[in-house]
Protein backbone atom coordinates (compact mmCIF):
# COMPACT_ATOMS: atom_id res chain seq x y z
CA UNK A 1 0.00 0.00 0.00
CA UNK A 2 1.31 3.47 -0.89
CA UNK A 3 2.27 5.76 1.98
CA UNK A 4 -0.49 8.12 3.06
CA UNK A 5 -0.05 11.68 1.84
CA UNK A 6 0.66 14.17 4.67
CA UNK A 7 -0.21 17.88 4.56
CA UNK A 8 -0.96 20.90 6.75
CA UNK A 9 -4.31 22.71 6.83
CA UNK A 10 -5.34 25.80 8.81
CA UNK A 11 -8.61 27.30 10.04
CA UNK A 12 -9.18 30.48 12.06
CA UNK A 13 -11.88 31.84 14.33
CA UNK A 14 -12.73 35.05 16.15
CA UNK A 15 -14.67 35.36 19.38
CA UNK A 16 -17.78 37.39 20.14
CA UNK A 17 -15.92 40.62 20.92
CA UNK A 18 -14.46 40.91 17.42
CA UNK A 19 -16.02 43.94 15.64
CA UNK A 20 -17.43 41.89 12.76
CA UNK A 21 -18.94 39.41 15.20
CA UNK A 22 -20.51 42.21 17.26
CA UNK A 23 -22.32 43.19 14.08
CA UNK A 24 -23.41 39.63 13.28
CA UNK A 25 -24.84 39.26 16.79
CA UNK A 26 -26.71 42.57 16.66
CA UNK A 27 -28.18 41.71 13.25
CA UNK A 28 -29.34 38.30 14.47
CA UNK A 29 -30.69 39.75 17.73
CA UNK A 30 -32.84 42.06 15.60
CA UNK A 31 -33.98 39.04 13.57
CA UNK A 32 -34.88 37.19 16.78
CA UNK A 33 -36.91 40.14 18.03
CA UNK A 34 -38.84 40.40 14.76
CA UNK A 35 -39.55 36.67 14.39
CA UNK A 36 -40.53 36.27 18.04
CA UNK A 37 -43.46 38.67 17.54
CA UNK A 38 -44.11 38.07 13.84
CA UNK A 39 -42.84 34.77 12.37
CA UNK A 40 -43.55 36.07 8.87
CA UNK A 41 -41.15 39.01 9.27
CA UNK A 42 -38.98 39.74 6.25
CA UNK A 43 -35.60 40.81 7.60
CA UNK A 44 -32.39 41.90 5.93
CA UNK A 45 -30.57 43.62 8.77
CA UNK A 46 -27.02 44.92 8.47
CA UNK A 47 -24.90 46.38 11.26
CA UNK A 48 -21.64 48.32 11.27
CA UNK A 49 -19.59 49.64 14.16
CA UNK A 50 -16.61 51.85 14.86
CA UNK A 51 -15.32 53.85 17.83
CA UNK A 52 -18.28 55.05 19.90
CA UNK A 53 -20.86 54.13 17.24
CA UNK A 54 -23.10 51.27 16.13
CA UNK A 55 -25.40 51.60 13.10
CA UNK A 56 -28.25 49.26 12.21
CA UNK A 57 -29.61 49.52 8.68
CA UNK A 58 -31.41 47.48 6.04
CA UNK A 59 -34.84 46.36 4.95
CA UNK A 60 -37.36 44.99 7.44
CA UNK A 61 -41.08 44.36 6.95
CA UNK A 62 -42.69 43.22 10.19
CA UNK A 63 -45.67 43.65 12.48
CA UNK A 64 -43.30 43.44 15.43
CA UNK A 65 -42.58 46.46 17.62
CA UNK A 66 -38.79 46.48 17.89
CA UNK A 67 -36.59 48.81 19.94
CA UNK A 68 -33.47 48.65 17.79
CA UNK A 69 -31.41 50.90 20.05
CA UNK A 70 -32.17 48.80 23.13
CA UNK A 71 -31.15 45.63 21.26
CA UNK A 72 -27.82 47.17 20.22
CA UNK A 73 -26.98 48.26 23.76
CA UNK A 74 -28.04 44.95 25.30
CA UNK A 75 -25.97 42.84 22.88
CA UNK A 76 -22.86 44.99 23.29
CA UNK A 77 -23.18 44.97 27.08
CA UNK A 78 -23.61 41.18 27.21
CA UNK A 79 -20.46 40.74 25.14
CA UNK A 80 -18.55 42.84 27.66
CA UNK A 81 -18.27 46.28 26.08
CA UNK A 82 -19.01 48.32 29.19
CA UNK A 83 -16.43 51.11 28.89
CA UNK A 84 -14.53 52.99 26.24
CA UNK A 85 -11.31 51.47 27.65
CA UNK A 86 -12.24 48.03 26.32
CA UNK A 87 -13.32 49.32 22.91
CA UNK A 88 -16.94 50.48 23.31
CA UNK A 89 -19.29 51.72 26.03
CA UNK A 90 -22.65 50.07 25.40
CA UNK A 91 -24.51 52.66 27.50
CA UNK A 92 -22.92 55.76 25.98
CA UNK A 93 -22.16 54.88 22.36
CA UNK A 94 -24.11 56.50 19.55
CA UNK A 95 -26.73 54.20 17.98
CA UNK A 96 -27.92 55.03 14.47
CA UNK A 97 -30.92 53.29 12.88
CA UNK A 98 -31.88 53.45 9.21
CA UNK A 99 -34.46 50.78 8.39
CA UNK A 100 -36.77 50.69 5.37
CA UNK A 101 -39.35 48.10 4.30
CA UNK A 102 -38.60 45.27 1.87
CA UNK A 103 -39.00 46.30 -1.75
CA UNK A 104 -42.53 45.42 -2.95
CA UNK A 105 -40.94 44.27 -6.21
CA UNK A 106 -39.12 41.55 -4.27
CA UNK A 107 -42.09 40.78 -2.03
CA UNK A 108 -44.60 40.14 -4.83
CA UNK A 109 -42.17 37.85 -6.64
CA UNK A 110 -40.94 35.85 -3.67
CA UNK A 111 -43.98 35.39 -1.42
CA UNK A 112 -46.79 37.19 -3.27
CA UNK A 113 -46.92 39.73 -0.45
CA UNK A 114 -47.88 36.89 1.86
CA UNK A 115 -50.40 35.17 -0.44
CA UNK A 116 -48.31 32.23 -1.71
CA UNK A 117 -48.63 28.76 -0.18
CA UNK A 118 -45.56 27.37 1.60
CA UNK A 119 -44.56 25.12 -1.28
CA UNK A 120 -44.89 28.04 -3.72
CA UNK A 121 -42.69 30.53 -1.87
CA UNK A 122 -39.73 31.37 -4.06
CA UNK A 123 -36.13 31.98 -3.11
CA UNK A 124 -35.46 35.52 -1.90
CA UNK A 125 -32.57 35.82 -4.32
CA UNK A 126 -30.41 33.83 -6.67
CA UNK A 127 -27.30 32.09 -5.42
CA UNK A 128 -25.57 28.82 -4.63
CA UNK A 129 -24.99 27.42 -1.16
CA UNK A 130 -22.95 24.54 0.24
CA UNK A 131 -23.15 22.06 3.08
CA UNK A 132 -20.20 19.97 4.24
CA UNK A 133 -19.54 17.12 6.66
CA UNK A 134 -16.54 14.95 7.55
CA UNK A 135 -16.13 12.01 9.92
CA UNK A 136 -12.93 13.33 11.52
CA UNK A 137 -14.73 14.66 14.65
CA UNK A 138 -17.86 13.66 16.61
CA UNK A 139 -19.49 16.88 15.37
CA UNK A 140 -18.85 15.70 11.79
CA UNK A 141 -16.93 18.94 11.27
CA UNK A 142 -13.30 19.65 10.31
CA UNK A 143 -10.92 19.38 13.27
CA UNK A 144 -9.11 22.61 12.38
CA UNK A 145 -12.38 24.53 12.51
CA UNK A 146 -13.64 22.81 15.67
CA UNK A 147 -10.45 23.54 17.63
CA UNK A 148 -10.15 27.15 16.45
CA UNK A 149 -13.80 27.78 17.32
CA UNK A 150 -13.61 26.09 20.73
CA UNK A 151 -10.46 28.01 21.65
CA UNK A 152 -12.31 31.26 20.92
CA UNK A 153 -15.28 30.12 22.98
CA UNK A 154 -13.02 29.16 25.89
CA UNK A 155 -11.33 32.58 25.75
CA UNK A 156 -14.71 34.19 26.32
CA UNK A 157 -15.68 31.70 29.02
CA UNK A 158 -12.59 32.31 31.17
CA UNK A 159 -12.99 36.07 30.72
CA UNK A 160 -16.61 36.10 31.83
CA UNK A 161 -16.20 33.67 34.75
CA UNK A 162 -13.21 35.57 36.15
CA UNK A 163 -10.58 32.84 35.72
CA UNK A 164 -8.56 35.23 33.53
CA UNK A 165 -9.71 38.71 34.61
CA UNK A 166 -7.06 40.41 32.47
CA UNK A 167 -8.85 39.36 29.28
CA UNK A 168 -10.84 41.84 27.19
CA UNK A 169 -13.61 40.95 24.69
CA UNK A 170 -11.77 40.96 21.35
CA UNK A 171 -9.71 37.97 20.24
CA UNK A 172 -8.72 35.66 17.41
CA UNK A 173 -7.54 32.06 17.15
CA UNK A 174 -6.00 29.91 14.44
CA UNK A 175 -5.13 26.21 14.34
CA UNK A 176 -2.95 24.28 11.88
CA UNK A 177 -3.39 20.51 11.82
CA UNK A 178 -1.22 17.91 10.13
CA UNK A 179 -3.43 15.50 8.21
CA UNK A 180 -2.96 12.33 6.27
CA UNK A 181 -5.15 11.67 3.27
CA UNK A 182 -6.48 8.13 2.90
CA UNK A 183 -8.37 8.00 -0.35
CA UNK A 184 -10.60 11.04 -0.02
CA UNK A 185 -10.81 10.83 3.78
CA UNK A 186 -9.02 13.27 6.09
CA UNK A 187 -7.23 11.73 9.07
CA UNK A 188 -5.86 14.20 11.66
CA UNK A 189 -2.39 13.29 12.96
CA UNK A 190 -1.37 16.14 15.26
CA UNK A 191 -1.76 19.84 15.91
CA UNK A 192 1.11 21.61 14.19
CA UNK A 193 0.51 25.23 15.30
CA UNK A 194 -1.81 27.12 17.64
CA UNK A 195 -2.12 30.90 17.34
CA UNK A 196 -4.05 33.04 19.81
CA UNK A 197 -4.19 36.83 19.73
CA UNK A 198 -6.35 38.18 22.52
CA UNK A 199 -7.15 41.66 23.76
CA UNK A 200 -5.92 42.25 27.30
CA UNK A 201 -5.63 44.76 30.10
CA UNK A 202 -2.56 47.02 29.87
CA UNK A 203 -1.06 45.87 33.18
CA UNK A 204 -0.76 42.12 32.50
CA UNK A 205 2.63 40.73 31.47
CA UNK A 206 3.21 38.71 28.33
CA UNK A 207 4.48 35.88 30.54
CA UNK A 208 1.19 35.83 32.47
CA UNK A 209 -0.78 35.89 29.21
CA UNK A 210 1.18 32.93 27.87
CA UNK A 211 0.86 30.92 31.09
CA UNK A 212 -2.89 31.48 31.39
CA UNK A 213 -3.61 30.77 27.73
CA UNK A 214 -1.73 27.47 27.95
CA UNK A 215 -3.29 26.39 31.25
CA UNK A 216 -6.86 27.71 31.01
CA UNK A 217 -7.57 27.85 27.27
CA UNK A 218 -5.42 25.45 25.24
CA UNK A 219 -5.09 22.45 27.58
CA UNK A 220 -8.84 22.19 28.35
CA UNK A 221 -9.76 22.43 24.64
CA UNK A 222 -7.14 20.60 22.58
CA UNK A 223 -6.98 16.83 23.20
CA UNK A 224 -3.56 15.86 24.54
CA UNK A 225 -3.17 13.21 21.83
CA UNK A 226 -2.84 15.98 19.24
CA UNK A 227 -0.13 17.92 21.11
CA UNK A 228 3.55 16.97 21.14
CA UNK A 229 6.95 18.56 21.74
CA UNK A 230 6.98 19.88 18.18
CA UNK A 231 3.68 21.75 18.40
CA UNK A 232 4.26 25.47 17.83
CA UNK A 233 2.49 28.08 19.99
CA UNK A 234 2.16 31.73 18.95
CA UNK A 235 0.46 33.41 21.91
CA UNK A 236 -0.10 37.15 21.43
CA UNK A 237 2.89 37.25 19.05
CA UNK A 238 2.46 40.99 18.35
CA UNK A 239 3.40 41.67 21.98
CA UNK A 240 0.55 44.08 22.77
CA UNK A 241 -3.21 43.99 22.10
CA UNK A 242 -4.83 46.50 24.47
CA UNK A 243 -6.89 48.48 21.95
CA UNK A 244 -9.61 46.26 20.51
CA UNK A 245 -13.25 45.94 19.61
CA UNK A 246 -14.72 48.73 17.48
CA UNK A 247 -11.98 51.08 18.72
CA UNK A 248 -9.35 48.91 17.06
CA UNK A 249 -11.17 48.01 13.84
CA UNK A 250 -14.43 48.80 12.08
CA UNK A 251 -16.94 45.95 12.07
CA UNK A 252 -19.56 44.86 9.56
CA UNK A 253 -22.18 42.10 9.36
CA UNK A 254 -21.30 39.18 7.11
CA UNK A 255 -17.52 39.44 6.98
CA UNK A 256 -16.73 36.18 8.75
CA UNK A 257 -18.49 33.69 6.48
CA UNK A 258 -15.73 31.06 6.54
CA UNK A 259 -15.54 31.18 10.34
CA UNK A 260 -19.34 30.79 10.36
CA UNK A 261 -19.17 27.63 8.26
CA UNK A 262 -16.33 25.11 7.77
CA UNK A 263 -13.05 26.96 8.25
CA UNK A 264 -12.15 26.85 4.56
CA UNK A 265 -13.08 23.21 3.99
CA UNK A 266 -15.82 22.26 1.56
CA UNK A 267 -16.88 25.31 -0.41
CA UNK A 268 -18.79 28.58 0.04
CA UNK A 269 -21.17 30.41 -2.26
CA UNK A 270 -20.33 33.81 -0.74
CA UNK A 271 -23.61 34.65 0.97
CA UNK A 272 -23.59 35.61 4.65
CA UNK A 273 -26.13 34.37 7.21
CA UNK A 274 -26.71 36.88 9.99
CA UNK A 275 -29.63 39.28 9.91
CA UNK A 276 -31.52 37.28 7.27
CA UNK A 277 -34.92 35.63 7.66
CA UNK A 278 -35.50 32.10 6.26
CA UNK A 279 -36.74 33.29 2.85
CA UNK A 280 -33.14 34.32 2.24
CA UNK A 281 -31.65 31.14 0.81
CA UNK A 282 -28.14 32.36 1.63
CA UNK A 283 -29.07 31.13 5.10
CA UNK A 284 -31.80 28.50 4.75
CA UNK A 285 -30.20 26.89 1.69
CA UNK A 286 -26.89 26.53 3.52
CA UNK A 287 -28.67 25.07 6.56
CA UNK A 288 -30.51 22.38 4.59
CA UNK A 289 -27.33 21.58 2.63
CA UNK A 290 -25.48 21.02 5.92
CA UNK A 291 -28.25 18.75 7.18
CA UNK A 292 -28.09 16.74 3.96
CA UNK A 293 -24.29 16.42 3.97
CA UNK A 294 -24.22 15.55 7.67
CA UNK A 295 -26.92 12.92 7.18
CA UNK A 296 -24.91 11.29 4.39
CA UNK A 297 -21.85 10.92 6.65
CA UNK A 298 -23.83 10.00 9.77
CA UNK A 299 -25.65 7.30 7.78
CA UNK A 300 -22.30 5.72 6.91
CA UNK A 301 -22.68 6.45 3.19
CA UNK A 302 -19.41 8.44 3.00
CA UNK A 303 -16.54 9.73 5.12
CA UNK A 304 -16.81 13.22 3.64
CA UNK A 305 -19.64 14.91 1.77
CA UNK A 306 -20.22 18.22 0.01
CA UNK A 307 -23.70 19.27 -1.10
CA UNK A 308 -24.41 22.26 -3.33
CA UNK A 309 -27.86 23.73 -3.98
CA UNK A 310 -28.66 26.69 -6.25
CA UNK A 311 -31.67 28.96 -6.68
CA UNK A 312 -33.31 31.63 -8.82
CA UNK A 313 -35.11 34.56 -7.21
CA UNK A 314 -38.88 33.95 -6.98
CA UNK A 315 -38.59 30.27 -8.02
CA UNK A 316 -39.38 27.61 -5.41
CA UNK A 317 -37.64 24.57 -6.84
CA UNK A 318 -33.82 24.62 -6.71
CA UNK A 319 -32.10 24.94 -10.06
CA UNK A 320 -29.60 22.24 -9.14
CA UNK A 321 -28.52 19.93 -6.33
CA UNK A 322 -25.02 18.44 -6.43
CA UNK A 323 -23.18 15.97 -4.21
CA UNK A 324 -19.49 15.06 -3.98
CA UNK A 325 -18.20 12.45 -1.53
CA UNK A 326 -14.57 12.85 -2.60
CA UNK A 327 -14.36 9.19 -3.56
CA UNK A 328 -15.31 8.04 -0.05
CA UNK A 329 -18.88 6.98 -0.81
CA UNK A 330 -20.14 3.44 -0.27
CA UNK A 331 -22.24 3.87 -3.42
CA UNK A 332 -21.98 6.15 -6.48
CA UNK A 333 -22.58 9.86 -5.83
CA UNK A 334 -25.51 9.73 -8.26
CA UNK A 335 -27.24 7.21 -5.98
CA UNK A 336 -26.50 9.29 -2.88
CA UNK A 337 -27.99 12.30 -4.66
CA UNK A 338 -31.19 10.33 -5.26
CA UNK A 339 -31.40 9.60 -1.53
CA UNK A 340 -30.84 13.27 -0.71
CA UNK A 341 -33.62 14.35 -3.09
CA UNK A 342 -35.89 11.68 -1.56
CA UNK A 343 -35.35 12.77 2.05
CA UNK A 344 -34.91 16.56 1.78
CA UNK A 345 -37.19 19.23 0.33
CA UNK A 346 -35.08 22.14 -0.87
CA UNK A 347 -37.97 24.55 -1.53
CA UNK A 348 -37.48 27.63 0.71
CA UNK A 349 -40.95 27.57 2.25
CA UNK A 350 -40.61 23.91 3.18
CA UNK A 351 -37.06 24.39 4.51
CA UNK A 352 -38.46 27.05 6.83
CA UNK A 353 -41.24 24.73 7.99
CA UNK A 354 -39.23 21.53 8.34
CA UNK A 355 -36.35 23.18 10.20
CA UNK A 356 -38.66 25.49 12.20
CA UNK A 357 -36.71 28.51 10.94
CA UNK A 358 -39.49 31.06 11.46
CA UNK A 359 -39.17 30.68 15.23
CA UNK A 360 -37.19 33.49 16.81
CA UNK A 361 -36.64 34.70 20.34
CA UNK A 362 -34.62 33.13 23.17
CA UNK A 363 -31.47 34.15 21.25
CA UNK A 364 -32.27 31.41 18.72
CA UNK A 365 -30.41 33.16 15.90
CA UNK A 366 -28.15 35.34 18.03
CA UNK A 367 -26.50 32.14 19.30
CA UNK A 368 -25.52 31.22 15.74
CA UNK A 369 -23.78 34.55 15.22
CA UNK A 370 -20.71 33.65 17.29
CA UNK A 371 -18.75 30.36 17.41
CA UNK A 372 -20.19 28.87 14.24
CA UNK A 373 -23.53 27.89 12.71
CA UNK A 374 -22.68 24.19 12.36
CA UNK A 375 -21.52 21.35 14.59
CA UNK A 376 -23.29 22.77 17.64
CA UNK A 377 -25.05 20.58 20.21
CA UNK A 378 -28.13 22.74 20.75
CA UNK A 379 -31.78 21.86 19.98
CA UNK A 380 -32.28 25.29 18.39
CA UNK A 381 -29.81 24.25 15.68
CA UNK A 382 -32.45 22.10 13.98
CA UNK A 383 -30.34 21.66 10.84
CA UNK A 384 -27.89 19.57 12.88
CA UNK A 385 -30.55 16.86 13.28
CA UNK A 386 -29.53 13.79 11.30
CA UNK A 387 -31.89 11.93 8.99
CA UNK A 388 -31.21 8.24 8.37
CA UNK A 389 -30.81 7.92 4.62
CA UNK A 390 -31.98 4.60 3.22
UniProtKB/Swiss-Prot annotation:
The keyword ATP-binding applies. K(+) binds at residue 46. One of its GO terms (biological process) is one-carbon metabolic process. ATP binds at residues 18, 170-172, 238-241, 249, 255-256, 272, 276, 280. It catalyses: L-methionine + ATP + H2O = S-adenosyl-L-methionine + phosphate + diphosphate. Coiled coil: none annotated. L-methionine binds at residues 59, 102, 249, 280. Keywords: ATP-binding, Cobalt, Cytoplasm, Magnesium, Metal-binding, Nucleotide-binding, One-carbon metabolism, Potassium, Transferase. Pfam families: S-AdoMet_synt_C, S-AdoMet_synt_M, S-AdoMet_synt_N. Binds 2 divalent ions per subunit. The metal ions interact primarily with the substrate. Can utilize magnesium, manganese or cobalt (in vitro). Binds 1 potassium ion per subunit. The potassium ion interacts primarily with the substrate. Mg(2+) binds at residue 12. It is found in: Cytoplasm. InterPro entries: ADOMET_SYNTHASE_CS, S-AdoMet_synt_C, S-AdoMet_synt_central, S-AdoMet_synt_N, S-AdoMet_synthetase, S-AdoMet_synthetase_sfam. Its EC number is 2.5.1.6. GO terms for molecular function: ATP binding; metal ion binding; methionine adenosyltransferase activity. SUPFAM superfamilies: S-adenosylmethionine synthetase. One of its GO terms (cellular component) is cytoplasm. Its cofactor is Mn(2+); Mg(2+); Co(2+); K(+). Pathway: Amino-acid biosynthesis; S-adenosyl-L-methionine biosynthesis; S-adenosyl-L-methionine from L-methionine: step 1/1. PANTHER family: S-ADENOSYLMETHIONINE SYNTHETASE (PTHR11964). HAMAP family: S_AdoMet_synth1. NCBIfam families: metK (TIGR01034). Belongs to the AdoMet synthase family. Homotetramer. Catalyzes the formation of S-adenosylmethionine from methionine and ATP. The reaction comprises two steps that are both catalyzed by the same enzyme: formation of S-adenosylmethionine (AdoMet) and triphosphate, and subsequent hydrolysis of the triphosphate. This is S-adenosylmethionine synthase. It comes from Chlamydomonas reinhardtii (Chlamydomonas smithii). The lineage of its organism: Eukaryota, Viridiplantae, Chlorophyta, core chlorophytes, Chlorophyceae.
